[in-house]
Amino acid sequence: MSDKGIFRTSSTPSIVDVTPDRGERPRKLVRSVLESPSQKDVASIVKIEQTPSRPFFNDFLKKRITDSLNERPNLLNKFMSAQDGTPSKSTGFNERSSQLVSEFTTTEDIENCEETTQVLPPRLVVYELRLTNFKSYAGTQIVGPFHPSFSSIVGPNGSGKSNVIDALLFVFGFRASKLRQSKASALIHKSATHPSLDSCDVEITFKEVNSDFTYVDGSELTVRRTAYKNNTSKYFVNGVESSFSAVSNLLKEKGIDLNHKRFLILQGEVESIAQMKPRAISEGDDGLLEYLEDIIGTSKYKPIIEENMQELSNSDDICAEKESRLKLVLSEKAKLEDSKNSVLSFLKDENELFMKQNQLYRTILYETRNKKTLVQNLLNSLEGKLQAHLEKFEQTERDISEKNEEVKSLREKAAKVKNDCTSEKKTRQSYEQQTVKIEEQLKFLLNKEKKLKKSIEALSFEKSEAENSLSSHDIDSQKLNSEIADLSLRLQQEELSLDDIRKSLQGKTEGISNAIEEKQKAMAPALEKINQLTSEKQILQVELDMLLNKENDLINDVESSQSSLDKLRNDAEENRNILSSKLKVLSDLKGEKKDVSKNIERKKETVHNTYRNLMSNRTKLEEMKASLSSSRSRGNVLESLQRLHESDNLNGFFGRLGDLATIDEAYDVAISTACPALNHIVVDNIETGQKCVAFLRSNNLGRASFIILKELAQKNLARIQTPENVPRLFDLLRFNDQKFAPAFYNVLQNTLVAKNLEQANRIAYGKTRWRVVTLSGQLIDKSGTMTGGGTRVKKGGMSSAITSDVSPASVETCDKQVQLEDTRYRQHLSELESLNQRFTEISERIPSAELEISKLQLDVSACDRLVAGEERRILQLKSDLKSIRNNNERKRNLQNKISNMDKEVEAININNEGLVTEIKTLQDKIMEIGGIRYRIQKSKVDDLHEQLKFVKDKLNKMSFKKKKNEQRSQSFQVELSNLTSEYDTTTESIATLKTELQSLNKYVDEHKSRLREFENALWDINSSIDELVKFIEFESKQMNSVKAERIELENQIQEQRTALSEVGNNENKYLKLMSNLKLHNLTEFCDQTTMDSTFPEYSEDELSSVDKSELVSNISVLKKKTEDREVDINVLSEYRRCNKEAEKRDSDYQSELQKRTDLKKVVTDLQSQRLDEFMYGFGIISMKLKEMYQIITMGGNAELELVDSLDPFSEGVLFSVMPPKKSWKNISNLSGGEKTLSSLALVFALHNYKPTPLYVMDEIDAALDFKNVSIVANYIKERTKNAQFIVISLRSNMFELSSRLVGIYKTANMTKSVTINNKEILTD
């Protein structure tokens, strides 16, 4: 910022210094008088006519302020006792405030505070303003950059200085009314130049600055607000749209609080700071107390304290209410004591009865469980044997399953390998087809190469001939030219000799010679014409010869090409016929393959179904054999007893239980599963049963279970209400005789029938437990256990349908059926194998056929290309021939022209025949006159003329021939070049195809090798599958034999389970009776040491020695004692309720008391913390205020005092001032300047306590005199390095001390600005 001599306007934002170097010239100041309280202090500067510079006065003030600060020995003592000589104010801090200040404020605290402020971290400052169409600023105007410490805004009245402050206020969220406008749209600039603008905006650029006034890199922050014509506005932060709350929070984090706006002191507002009331009169107002609390930070406690006070008040009300409710419930409890005692006596008697019943039930249970143990041991033995069979059966099943999985895995592997084979075949076929295609292409290219080679050789020979001819022409031409030169020389010599002879005969022949010359002159045009015609004729004759030769060549080419085309067409037709037959064969093969594939799928399904039927029938056969064996065993017992009954030796025998009733076939599985006792034998009494047992034992016929009708308890057999109205299994039976109903009910009880397992679960596990069986044989017991289901279900239990069906004849029939199915299975398997072989054979033939077809297609395609090529060649030749023949007009014209030339020459000769004759006659005369010598010489000359003409004609013909050969050579060269290029391309293509063919052959060989590997692997897998299938068939037969043994054991186990079930039912009965016994819990009303709350446990010895008859007698006595008494049991519950209610209400009351105590502590702590923090800050601010006021006024005094010393927050804070050499006065009684100084002293004191990085002041020095302006300006410059001051001032004492001046001026009703660095100038 040291650019010199550069003037900056608002359009050039760089900062410049328009002053020369400080040592260049002195600076004159106007005459001024500095008034002060002591003339002695400023005697050296009074009435200075010619001062060296303003800095002298500034230095004086700086020294005065520094001395004042250094002279104070102790701020706290000075504050308390006014040791500076000024009278102490009796209405100042009273005893309480003095105590608080001394308690919370010490000199060390203040010094520490000062020391802390010396460590200046980076702070946020306003760098510059960018105003666009804002109020008086038209267009975009940049105001600034501002100095990080002290900047002054100067300019004439009305130029727009305050609009700078308005711009800041606008961005800081002030309404238009605060900016001296009625609405936001009024802020948009309007002038003659810019009468109608749509918007205006102000952008503030902030930067962070270090203590040495260097800016922090990357710290730039821009905040912009834009107002529109429709009175709306938007905020932007760093160019991104934002909101006022976001802007406010962002700046608050940087230290600029937009809510309290302490940093803004607007025009006319400086005096109002010190004139604030001690505290706010109403909510929303601000008093001095609130002003200080916001700065100190204790205002945050106010809403919290108020909220807690409200809660404390509410808690007092709740405590009173809860105490009243507690007393009410205690009174109600006392009224129930007598009724409670009566009920307790009755319940104790009932508990004694339940004790006796519990002991009786436990004794019976002990006996039942001993019996259950014996049955269980036998059952465990049978189940152990069954388990061994099951393990063997399951092991076999696992082996079969594992082998099946192996077969499945191998078949999947075989399928994968088969797919790989197919894929390899297709890949190999694809490569073979590509090979054939390339071989055909190679064959075609080799033929083409051969033809091209012949054509190149022929053309090369013709070109060589033409070039040789041209070469010999040059030699011959040279010879002829040499000969012409010799002849011309000789002719010249001979003519000279002839002229000499003529000259010698001139006298004799002059007349004749003249006549000859005249006639020769007359004949010269004709001779010239003849020579011209002869030359033209020779040219036309050459052209005519060329046309005739080309036509003959084309005719020969057409005939040759037509012959080749006919041969190619015959070859193509032959290949097409072969291809057609091959395609038909391929189509037939594919059709047959498709049919065979379908037949294979059908046959596979047939084989699968046949195998499934075979295995099913085998299983059925084994089950029938096992069932027949079991039926025979069971039938022997029943049949023997039946014969005994028929012989009248066994009265009361009724037969098998399942034969004494019938049921619908739909419920066959359900009854067979739910009632294992259907095979039990029914007798009338124990005696009959004992006879049956003795008979079976004596005859060694086996065992049987019996149901004794007379021993069955009488039950209510009427229909019952069931869940979801499902039927009860007992109700579905049709009895042979109603007397058998109790027997069936005894084994079935209330077993229900559900349609499916889902319905069974709903019913069985409902509120009431039920025994439920499904139609498919799944049984859910009351205990929750589930049995039955699976692949093999029980059926035929109600009748002997299955037993009667399983006869030896039916077993034999089933065996024959199994053998028949086995034969069919093997036959279908053989047919499937044949189909697979045929499918494989067809699959192998198809690729070969496709390969042959591919070759034929390539041959046909090649022939078609050759035919098309020959046809195009013939068409082109015929087109050329036609073009030549169409050019006959030219040929006729040439012939006519040559003929006309001949005629014209002949006519000329005829016309000049007389002259020729005359000339010859005259020449003959000269010959006669000249004699022999002349004739000889004349003959020589004529002979030389003839020779020269002959040689020249020969030379001309050679020139024509040379031209023709040159044309032919060029034509041959072009054609040879094309043929050579085509030959090279063909050769390259052949090499490429050979490489491709070699690579493809390699691929084909590789895929053939892989195909062989896959085929070998497939054969190995199929062999393994065959071995596994044989193993599975053998194991399946073994498993069927194990099934028969298992069925016999299951029947024995079922009998023992039935017996165990009966014992279990009896056990459950007494367990249920025991579970219904519940002792009344009286421990909460009686002494726990004398009152049992649970039943006692008994040892086996105690149970075995119990006298059941005595117990029954005692139980009877207790029942009579309790049956006749009537008591209201509900009294206990009511007493219990009252007691619990009393405890609950007492607990609530104590809890609320504790809550109230806690709230009181919270409120006390908050109030104490608020007071402590406020008084600490208040003491520091008071000290600083006193110090600031003394510095600013040079001897005055100011105090902040509490209106109520006991409670600073009740009446607020007073601001009292004692101007220099005056008494203590209230702020309202001060002059304008004194009010301003007081406010500024408070502002500076608050800044010292809690610095704000930015202050914006608008003409705060308006009411101050020259001296006070200088004091304030010096203080701002020297003592506020940690803040940025932007001051609008018209007082030179103020703005001359600023570090930077921002000048505001207006032209054409549009404000502009200029910024300069304000540097001091030293005088000589």
From Swiss-Prot:
ATP binds at residues 155-162. Changing residue 19 to A: Defects in chromosome condensation. One of its GO terms (biological process) is cell division. Keywords: ATP-binding, Cell cycle, Cell division, Chromosome, Coiled coil, Cytoplasm, DNA condensation, Mitosis, Nucleotide-binding, Nucleus, Phosphoprotein. Forms a heterodimer with cut14/smc2. Component of the condensin complex, which contains the smc2 and smc4 heterodimer, and three non smc subunits that probably regulate the complex: cnd1, cnd2 and cnd3. Interacts with C1739.07. Central component of the condensin complex, a complex required for conversion of interphase chromatin into mitotic-like condense chromosomes. The condensin complex probably introduces positive supercoils into relaxed DNA in the presence of type I topoisomerases and converts nicked DNA into positive knotted forms in the presence of type II topoisomerases. Residues 651-764 form the SMC hinge domain. GO terms for molecular function: ATP binding; ATP hydrolysis activity; DNA translocase activity. This is Structural maintenance of chromosomes protein 4. Phosphorylated by CDC2 on Thr-19 at metaphase.
